[in-house]
Amino acid sequence: MDKRISIAIDGPAAAGKSTVAKVVAKELSYVYIDTGAMYRTLTYAALEQKVDIENEEQLMEVVRNVNIEFQQGENTQLVFLNGQDVSEVIRTPDVTNRVSIVAKHRLVREEMVRRQQDLAKKGGVVMDGRDIGTHVLPDAEVKIFMLASVEERAERRHLENLNKGFDSNLEQLKEEIAQRDKLDSEREVSPLKKADDALELDTTSLSIEEVVQKIMSIVSGVFAK
């Protein structure tokens, strides 16, 4: 397995992309790049600066002054905003419910995609998001599109919130996830959609281990070529 490939994992909100991508990256000793965390960090920075997130010009000013870095912690990946650890605060419902608005702006996405492509230049990466296979890494050797029902995804996010000590309402989460799906798939710039050459993986009734196993067997097939 000397070959260093790029693996793109796309899918809607709370489909389990990040969880699976982290495990796959660890199994392969690859770098994991969480593009969702990059948009979350930008959203957090904009909210902290009380910027109008519907205003692209104001957001671009934030983007220009934001340095986002990843570091491997003991059991998880840490996210830093201008040197400050923001790994936890970017996961609050406040940020979660606004990240799709920030991500819809053309200039914002163009700059973020440029940064993401920069991080992936040398290969040996697992990257997850909404438009990785279609836009960020169109030449990735492995492309996965993960799906799960709104109900299943809301349940997962609900448990995640409770485990982190956040208030959580399951019915409200179902509505919010459906709304994020709508925003992500209908936006003009790089909408959420399956790449033509991506393999679709419905994770509704699968465990994390089963999903990882399926992806690893796809990767093994690529290495065998």
Swiss-Prot record:
It comes from Bacillus cereus (strain G9842). The keyword Glycoprotein does not apply. GO terms for cellular component: cytosol. ATP binds at residues 11-19. It catalyses: CMP + ATP = CDP + ADP; dCMP + ATP = dCDP + ADP. GO terms for molecular function: ATP binding; CMP kinase activity; dCMP kinase activity. InterPro entries: Cytidylate_kin, Cytidylate_kinase_dom, P-loop_NTPase. Its EC number is 2.7.4.25. Signal peptide: none annotated. NCBIfam families: cmk (TIGR00017). One of its GO terms (biological process) is pyrimidine nucleotide metabolic process. The gene is cmk. This is Cytidylate kinase. Belongs to the cytidylate kinase family. Type 1 subfamily. Its main location: cytoplasm. The keyword Lipid biosynthesis does not apply. Keywords: ATP-binding, Cytoplasm, Kinase, Nucleotide-binding, Transferase.
